[in-house]
Amino acid sequence: MFGERLRQLRRERKVSQKELAEYLGISIRGYQFYESEDNEPNIKTLLALADFYGVTTDYLLGRSDRRN
């Protein structure tokens, strides 16, 4: 669920994985691991993603269908 939501939000905003990785200060591969759900972000990164997309962490994690 988390990876799907990240991918959907990124595509809606028309942002590349490279741009997001740079924003987060991580490698592109590190970001790709989030979208493929091979790795989970730490709380700092999760909060940065929620802020970037203007959604709640609960939405990102699939705990809620409400974005804000």
Spans of features found by a protein language model:
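Absolute protein N-terminus
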Residues: 1-3, 68
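DNA major-groove recognition helix of helix-turn-helix/homeodomain DNA-binding modules
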Residues: 25, 44-59
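Short basic helix-loop element that most often maps to the first helix and adjoining turn
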Residues: 4-23, 48
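Conserved hydrophobic/aromatic packing and binding residues within compact polymer-binding modules
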Residues: 6, 20-21, 31-34, 60
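Short, basic-rich loop-to-helix N-cap that marks the start of a DNA-contacting helix
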Residues: 38-48, 67
